[in-house]
Amino acid sequence: MAEDIHELYAIRYGHHARRSPDNFIGGDLHDVLQPLDFFVWAIVGPSGTIVLDTGFDEAMGKKRQREMIKPVRDGLAALGIAADSIKDVIISHLHYDHCGNYDLFPQARYHLQDREMAYATGRCMCHQALRAPFEVDDVVAMVRKVFAGRCAFHDGEDEIVPGVTVHHIGGHSKGLQSVRVKTRLGPIVLAADASHLYAHMDGGRVYPLTYNVEEVVEGYARLKRLAAAPGHVVPGHDPLVLKRYPAARPGLEGWVVRLDAEPKQV
């Protein structure tokens, strides 16, 4: 494996049953079942594993009425990855489903955008409509990591290790960043919540919980430009990811899939 080529995995840890009108600004005339899945991602390279996002735990799932499928720690363990061995964690943004489990990676340095920390600790959090997807304990835990010297801040585009770069997209959250990973198939983009579902970026539609609509829709084209091909942009919450990509190994179907593989059309 070249020093900048990585394997890439999506780990499903949660689920939320909901209908399609809940997933789009303006609703959806079809009004069909359209659930969301919750993922974290493992980026495995010669220098070790980088984790993108940290999910939430069972207690937070109950509080937010989200179903916990399997703990994040177990998903990593299924790939032979020990959580306490992780040295770098990328946080796409500070919403509850992306930055919980804040004690799971005791050795890690956390990478996030300047704008996201400023957003999550500034005047916007005075407004319920904007702070709703944040959990104060998660944000405070990240502030503590700053004071412990365990955070690295990025402004726009930056390299984490050779072959892995972060890119500020914004939109859904002010400091939202997506991740571009060099793989055997070329660059694959982990959109995180820059596109919750394939239907968002493919149809130019917008998830209702949004800080800046313009940044969302402009971001779709940018995600596709960053990838080797439009089909190599992986959305953050789409159950179709588990159908389009193969299981990481036998027995992990519907739980852990390998993303540096050609996706099926389903």
Residue ranges of model-derived segments:
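Divalent metal-coordination and catalytic microenvironments
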Residues: 8, 43, 53, 86, ...
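Beta-strand-turn-beta hairpins that frame and shape the catalytic cleft
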Residues: 2-8, 44-49, 158-165, 183-187
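Conserved beta-strand hairpin/beta-sheet module of binuclear metal-dependent hydrolase folds
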Residues: 13-78, 178-192
